[in-house]
Amino acid sequence: MADISALAEVCRKHGTLLAVDNAHGAYLRFLEPSCHPLDLGADLCCDSAHKTLPVLTGGAYLHISRAAPASLRESAKTAMAMFGSTSPSYLTLASLDLCNRYLADGYRDRLREMCGRLEEARKALTAAGWQVEPSDPLRLTVKAPAGMTGGQLANRLRESGVECEYADPDFLVLMLTPENRAADIERLVYAIGTNDAVYAPQPSQPLARGERVCSAREALFAPRETIPAAQSLGRVCGAPTVGCPPAIPIAVSGERIGPEALELFRRYGVEQVEVLR
């Protein structure tokens, strides 16, 4: 998790506002103490409630700090209207309202209990030989040891009826909610089992250095074709290419695809890319 308090201090020092994309952190307000960006000094914050709370897909909140300039609060609705739909989903809006009832009905206590269980699970996995990475309180992030991938760990869990949130060559990420039972945590720890493999230092993958051939706008409006990623060396990228969005693109529109990008395509399972004709 980012150090929002420090970022807010820097922003105040330089007289600028701090806006935070808190997509996966809507629940942070209910921790004790609160870890929500607005409570840590942010001026503006967007929470994708549907990611961590019982809200229909697309349901989100835009929060504006009471300490933010009045002009920000006054202009926010007009600014949102520039991009918002004129046909909103009232089902989604209703789910946000119903979520307020859910949050008021013992959610804070259930969240505290689940965070305690997860902390015990982290200790148990560490004792069993796994490297557990720092993460937000409702996530469990396990680094894959030498000779194993996060995907292989995910398959091991799937065989025991446990589905992960995300897996890549390096990590396995699991996400829980206050509605998970103690038995769910026990099954998770049992399914992962013990690890005897070593954690050898791994060199970080360098970011691909793309050569700019044209602007992103020119590339997006140019004729494009989809080709196997392995055959894209030297071609100009037509659409941003990532292993799992949202993420830092391996290649962006208008860049010539180089050997570093090709290696990252292979590593993160990107099989096809759009290139200019």
Segments from the language model and where they lie:
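Terminal helix/beta-alpha structural elements that buttress the NAD(P)+-binding lobe
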Residues: 272
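Conserved PLP-enzyme active-site core in the AAT-like
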Residues: 1-131, 144
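Conserved C-terminal alpha-helix-loop-beta "cap" of PLP-dependent enzymes
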Residues: 126-253, 259-268
